[in-house]
Amino acid sequence: MGFSDGASYALSLGLTNGDLFTHVIAFSPGFMAPASRRGKPPVFVSHGTHDSVLPIERCSRRIVPQLDRAGYQVRYREFDGPHTVPESIAREALHWFSSNEGTADVDAPGDDGI
């Protein structure tokens, strides 16, 4: 889980190590740069429509379709606001995580022959 640059790192590390993480939560990410992808943890992404720090058009509105095309289960929420995490979005993300609404495709250790 992360916000802003922390969300970018959460996406990058969570997708690279999807065999270790059951879920990824990214609040207002700027990019994702996974080295390689293992597993398919479900992903929660949110972004403010008035974000001037990491504009939604250049960030989440590009990231989410890439995740969809790659076969990830994504819950995406846009909200009317700036570069922040509204309480309602944080609560929704925590509910999503704690209720196991997303079921991760996690590889068991050793499945890849390593």
Predicted regions and their residues:
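Active-site-proximal beta-strand/loop segments in catalytic clefts of secreted hydrolases
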Residues: 1-5, 27-30, 46-50, 78-82
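C-terminal catalytic histidine-bearing segment of alpha/beta-hydrolase fold enzymes
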Residues: 46, 52, 57-114
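Tryptophan-centric aromatic hotspots in well-structured domains and transmembrane helices
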Residues: 21, 44-47
